[in-house]
């Protein structure tokens, strides 16, 4: 696993509760921001970029030319004074990302995995080497994904959900998350497990290694190792045999980096 350190439910609750809540915005403007009235003008009459950075404001572009295109990125409360005297949709446009958000997205630059555009991965998620996260997947805070595991398109891993090594969570599947109450147990999926498309694994359920959850199943009870479960609610329909193992085998080439 890389990146985050494993957190308990109580630690996640404290992390969210104590986090500075931010409304991140990206402002694109032509015109000059109100550096003086916002208190960001240096003695030499130029923008005080150090003071801006200390407030978490990132500025891009030529701020010495009035009508050149500029970009300002930061928390709305810090950025708003810079727009005094300017007119929205005339002098500038704003893109918002959330409102009073407590948990940023995960910085994935150091992760040795394949993460496709459009995946939403929150901070404090652990991702193993050669894992694959497909577009549209949503991974909530505290989730863990083992080495070589694929999270397919549109799948959802709720808070603290855990998936072992070399497993596959099918498109649209949901592993229910548990952050509150803190005493509740999260979903745990073992190694070499296949969870079919649009299946749902309810809070606290454990799926044993080597098992298969059929597409569309709703799993409300623990699943033993090396069995196939199907239905609503899911029930064991057979043990894993050679034919099933062949049909559900993973493709290593998809995990190459």
Curated annotation (Swiss-Prot):
Protein name, as recorded: 2,3,4,5-tetrahydropyridine-2,6-dicarboxylate N-acetyltransferase
Annotated function: Catalyzes the transfer of an acetyl group from acetyl-CoA to tetrahydrodipicolinate.
Keyword list, A-Z: Acyltransferase, Amino-acid biosynthesis, Diaminopimelate biosynthesis, Lysine biosynthesis, Repeat, Transferase
Enzyme Commission identifier(s): 2.3.1.89
The protein's annotated pathway: Amino-acid biosynthesis; L-lysine biosynthesis via DAP pathway; LL-2,6-diaminopimelate from (S)-tetrahydrodipicolinate (acetylase route): step 1/3
GO molecular function, one term: tetrahydrodipicolinate N-acetyltransferase activity
Superkingdom to which the source organism belongs: Bacteria
Enzyme class: transferase
Family: Belongs to the transferase hexapeptide repeat family. DapH subfamily.
GO terms under biological process: diaminopimelate biosynthetic process; lysine biosynthetic process via diaminopimelate
Source organism of the structure: Lactococcus lactis subsp. cremoris (strain SK11)
CDD domains: LbH_THP_succinylT
Keyword Repeat set for record: yes
Reaction(s) catalysed (UniProt annotation): (S)-2,3,4,5-tetrahydrodipicolinate + acetyl-CoA + H2O = L-2-acetamido-6-oxoheptanedioate + CoA
Keyword Lipid biosynthesis: no
Pfam family, one: DapH_N
NCBIfam families registered for this protein in UniProt: DapD_Ac (TIGR03532)
